[in-house]
Amino acid sequence: MAELENPSVMSKLIAFLSSLLERVAESNDLTRRVATQSQRVSVFHGLSRPTITIQSYLERIFKYANCSPSCFVVAYVYLDRFTHRQPSLPINSFNVHRLLITSVMVAAKFLDDLYYNNAYYAKVGGISTKEMNFLELDFLFGLGFELNVTPNTFNAYFSYLQKEMTLLQPLSLVVVPSSRSLITFNDDEASHQKQQQQQLAV
């Protein structure tokens, strides 16, 4: 998509995705503390919160992964699918970094003709190659190997991101109660307008 080739659009996209994921993680951290049902711990769950911010981490991935800009939109689609298929593994501050590096790597492997191997992504993400391999496998099974993103789905997610970035331009941020998911679209996009109103707006 031509707009994604624009560096200013990509820097805004990175900033917005970081902000969104940070709010989702913080919201789920609070929910986790008061939740009566236990949340499953997975390979994505770190023992402690990483010291690097989500935005710095995503900028690092963008700088070193050298994947196509579309990978970041597709990674977002994958994260959304993952959270819907794995409701007991909501995005939080203990797993968001690992989910990010894994979703971008899987998106690059699926979309791009040329991409780096797992060892390279492990270095970029600050984890071991063995851990990167486990994360990839768990992520793929968590997605049910549903990696294809139709043009309609891609455009719907990208349009949503564009709209939200435009709304945040004046950066008057309003926080509203959130649900667990990021955004919900069906591949057929038949109920796109209705679903857009039900998206996460943290």
UniProtKB/Swiss-Prot annotation:
BP GO annotations: cell division
InterPro entries noted in UniProt: Cyclin-like_sf, Cyclin_P/U, Cyclin_PHO80-like
Tissue note: Expressed in roots, stems and flowers. Expressed in the shoot apex, leaf primordia and young leaves.
Annotated CDD domains: CYCLIN_AtCycU-like
Keywords, ordered alphabetically: Cell cycle, Cell division, Cyclin
SUPFAM superfamilies for this protein: Cyclin-like
Any one Pfam family match given in the protein's UniProt record, by short name: Cyclin
Annotated GO MF terms: protein kinase binding
Gene3D superfamilies found in the cross-reference section: Cyclin-like
Family that this chain belongs to: Belongs to the cyclin family. Cyclin U/P subfamily.
Assembly with partners or alone: Interacts with CDKA-1.
Identification of the protein by name: Cyclin-U4-1
GN (gene name): CYCU4-1
